[in-house]
Amino acid sequence: MSMQDTVADMLTRVRNAQMAKKQTVSMPSSKLKVAIANVLQQEGYISNVEVAQEEAKATLTLTLKYFEGKPVIETVKRVSRPGLRQYRGKDKIPSVKQGLGIAIVSTSKGIMTDRAARAAGIGGEVIAFVS
């Protein structure tokens, strides 16, 4: 059985690992997952992104962050999904928690935050909300 929505699986693994107070979480790697993980690291939601290559398959390992025993990521929600893609123009990119969270957007210039997409003046597919 093949996995249908790998990004939703990634976000669920991160959410479950943080609820279980794990330090790291591992998953199968892809270019999209690595790009999303790099955005999360740049924004300070996770501490480290590591890709390990074992023969034919690559594994993505994320080091999670906690502040005073609580996970740094409060909520993570998949927005655009395989059954209902969510595309937004440059003027319609949503703001998460009035700017306290981020929206991860897939644009023609790559994966970036909502703020970076607005600054670049480009829209795209809204992948997820993180706060």
UniProtKB/Swiss-Prot annotation:
Subunit structure: Part of the 30S ribosomal subunit. Contacts proteins S5 and S12.
GO biological process, one term: translation
InterPro entries named in the record: Ribosomal_uS8, Ribosomal_uS8_CS, Ribosomal_uS8_sf
Gene Ontology CC: ribonucleoprotein complex; ribosome
HAMAP family referenced in this protein's UniProt entry, alphabetically: Ribosomal_uS8_B
Keywords: Ribonucleoprotein, Ribosomal protein, RNA-binding, rRNA-binding
Molecular function as annotated in GO: rRNA binding; structural constituent of ribosome
This protein's record includes keyword Protein biosynthesis: no
Top-level taxon: Bacteria
Assigned protein family: Belongs to the universal ribosomal protein uS8 family.
Role, per record: One of the primary rRNA binding proteins, it binds directly to 16S rRNA central domain where it helps coordinate assembly of the platform of the 30S subunit.
The protein's name: Small ribosomal subunit protein uS8
